[in-house]
Regions:
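Surface-exposed loop/interface segments of Gram-negative outer-membrane beta-barrel transport/assembly proteins
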Residues: 2, 118-186, 197, 227-234, ...
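Short, small/polar-rich motifs associated with maturation and membrane association
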Residues: 1-240, 245-254, 258, 319-322, ...
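Active-site and adjacent substrate-binding regions of carbohydrate-active enzymes
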Residues: 333
């Protein structure tokens, strides 16, 4: 780095191993100067956005270019397991990212996964953790934590001021069920009942080995991150294989492959919002123990637990990266490398809105929405490098690059209305 004029910062595998995170992108926050990391939401598996040295455009994306094992990627780093990453290099300015042209105008994030480089022996490594998440701060609402009389006093004063003393005898002031619950001191803390402790678990196993001629690596990873509201969750399975064969000291070849399978449950719309609006004097349960749809007849907000059961938002994503290379070094300091890499990713987003939801009001027939996208990207790079140093003072480093890239993107959307009551978004496949 001392020979570079551009701004480059790196995060190594050793640094990554010390951090506990479900999204590799979050490891850059606060550790790389000039890099801002923002999550779109706190739901498990939510997207993460990176800005390098601030906002460059008000009309277009400010996302940097991601290059994973030599292949420009559209998917960011969410599908990667931090245990599989060798290094992350962030190129911040125009001089350091010039090789990528206009695509690198917002900076470049280069991710290199672990490959086969061990020449002797055999090692098996395991890393993992299990953790719990709990809400650290729940807003103090009027009448929460069993203090329902505080809400009753507030509501009484509000109605007197707005409608007069006579309004307290109106049936829409307090329902018979609310009066019964107040009489017996039965109050419901909606936010605390809807929130829950959540489990996060991650396990990674890797094996490396080799001889003088052959090196290999293999890894498996599993991550499950549950949310603190409803059935929100993120699940990821990863696998990687690397092989390198050395014909001689001058000539070698190798392959690297990476596969990631991701499933995200984004939970229900409106459930948490509804919990903020419902008073502690109403219950989510009917007398027979089943869930009520309208907990309070005078409110437009439905039972959040019913919303969770009847509104599904799910995403299924797959990612595959395969690369093969040949490298030849005819003389000391001069090397030629040819690499071809193929990346394929697909994602399917589906949403189901049942009859018993806030949007349908318990009256209209269910509807479903499905969005699907597929990306195929291949790159062929041919690189000639000459590196020579004279008397430990003068250094010459020259690089010649010829690259060919092709991208193919396909997508579709569909929506279905009036679907059977007990179906889901898979009904419109």
């Amino acid at each position: 780095k001392k020979d570079l004029t551009g701004s480059i910062q790196s995060v190594t595998s050793k640094e990554l191993s010390k951090l506990v995170t479900t999204d590799v992108t979050e490891t850059l926050n606060g550790r790389v100067g000039g890099v801002l990391v923002n999550k779109t939401s706190n739901r498990p598996g939510s997207d993460t956005k990176i800005e390098i040295r601030g906002i460059n455009s008000f009309n277009f994306s400010n996302e940097p270019l991601y290059v994973i094992d030599g292949v420009p990627s559209q998917t960011g780093m969410r599908h990667l397991n931090s245990a599989d990453i060798e290094s992350i290099d962030i190129l911040k300015d125009a001089s350091s990212s010039a090789i990528y042209g206009s695509r690198g105008a917002n900076g470049v994030v280069i991710i290199t996964t672990k490959g086969a480089n061990k020449r002797q022996g055999f090692n098996i490594d395991y890393s993992g953790y299990v953790g719990f998440k709990t809400p650290t701060r729940i807003p103090e609402m009027i009448g929460n934590m069993g203090n329902g009389l505080e809400y009753v006093d507030y509501r009484t004063a509000l109605w007197k001021k707005k409608y007069g003393d006579a309004s307290l005898s109106r049936p829409d002031f307090l329902t018979d069920d609310e009066k019964r619950r107040i009489k017996h001191g039965e109050y419901y803390d909606w936010l605390r009942e809807l929130s829950q402790n959540a489990l996060t678990t991650s396990h990674s196993v890797s094996a490396t080995g080799g001889t003088d001629k052959l090196s290999f690596s293999f890894g498996l990873g599993y991550l499950k991150d549950d949310g603190m509201v409803g059935d929100e969750s993120f699940e990821r399975i990863t696998a990687n294989v690397g092989l390198e064969y050395r014909f001689s000291d001058k000539f070698k070849t190798g392959i690297n492959s990476y596969v990631s399978l991701n499933n995200t449950n984004e939970g229900a719309n409106d459930a948490l919002i509804n919990a903020y609006f419902l008073p502690p004097t109403v219950s989510p349960y009917d007398k027979d123990g089943s869930y009520l749809f309208n907990c309070q007849p005078t409110s437009s907000k439905i039972n959040p637990f019913v919303q969770i059961e009847n509104n599904k938002r799910e995403k299924e994503a797959n990612y595959t990266n395969f690369s093969g290379y040949l490298e030849y070094q005819p003389i000391k300091g001069l090397s030629f490398k040819s690499q071809i890499a193929v990346q394929y990713d697909s994602d399917v987003y589906g949403e189901w809105v049942g009859t018993m939801t806030q949007a349908k009001g318990g009256l209209n027939a269910p509807e479903a929405y499905r969005k699907e996208g597929r990306n195929m990207n291949w790159v062929w790079d041919n690189i000639i490098t000459y590196d020579k140093t004279w008397k430990n003072i003068h250094r010459l480093n020259a690089i010649g690059l010829y690259s060919v890239q092709k991208e193919n993107h396909k997508g579709s959307e569909m929506r279905g209305d009036g679907l059977p009551y007990n179906s889901d978004w898979h009904a419109i496949e």
